[in-house]
Design a protein with these regions (language model features):
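Conserved thiamine diphosphate
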Residues: 1-83, 92, 201
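Thiamine diphosphate
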Residues: 50-205
Length: 205
């Protein structure tokens, strides 16, 4: 952001994933924060909370149960063969992408993986087994984050969904500006991601 490259934290998930016994929580909204904070009181061991710096809107179904280590379905469409997986403050982009795809007649599941470690492999297995297309979106380095967790799992499975990651490139940012300005500089916007997804789906323009 405006504070410059020294204040960018886009490698933290990768670093924390590598630490034994570390629990890693990357919430998408205040509801997830509230519920996991309550649960963390009785948790044994360290927890790394990856929080955004400003008030994100509540997008979770507040009647749904939020648990540490369990994914949170934000949008669920039984007839869709496409899943968008995201974590943390990429929530706005994930929902904008879903909305833009709907305008093209493409419906998706949108799932918040708020706990990166321990990861919800049970839900991921169901997604990988049932969806033809899987996309991950995260405001983190392309290396070591949510996309890496998912790609590692797919690589070791016998399943073969079409999979693509959307994240920040493996380079330091020399830009100074707002979060949205830097997202645009790195082509990490909903419009560009939507177009890339449509191309992957073979959408005819």
């Amino acid at each position: 952001g405006p504070a410059g490259a020294t204040h960018h934290s886009i490698e933290d998930i990768a670093i924390m994933r590598a630490l034994p016994n570390m629990t890693l929580f990357s919430p998408c909204d205040p509801y997830e924060v509230e519920k996991i904070t309550e649960e963390s009181i009785n948790h044994q061991g360290p927890i790394y909370f990856r929080l955004a710096k400003k008030g994100e809107p509540i997008i979770s179904n507040q009647e749904s149960k939020i648990e540490l280590g369990k994914a949170n379905f934000i949008e669920k469409n039984e007839n869709s063969n496409i899943a968008i997986l995201f974590t943390g403050n990429a929530s706005d982009i994930a929902l904008e992408v879903s909305s833009e795809l709907k305008e093209r007649g493409v419906v998706t599941d949108v799932i918040s993986f708020h706990t990166i470690k321990p990861f919800d492999y049970e839900t991921l297995d169901k997604i990988v087994s049932s969806k033809k297309y899987i996309f991950t979106i995260e405001e983190h380095s392309i290396i070591g984050g949510l996309g890496s967790v998912v790609s590692e799992y797919i690589a070791e499975s016998r399943l073969n969904p079409i999979f693509k990651r959307f994240a920040l490139p493996d380079e330091y940012s020399h830009y100074v500006g707002s979060q949205f300005y830097i997202r645009e500089k790195f082509e990490f916007t909903s419009a560009l991601i939507s177009n890339k997804i449509l191309n992957t789906l073979g959408y005819k323009w």
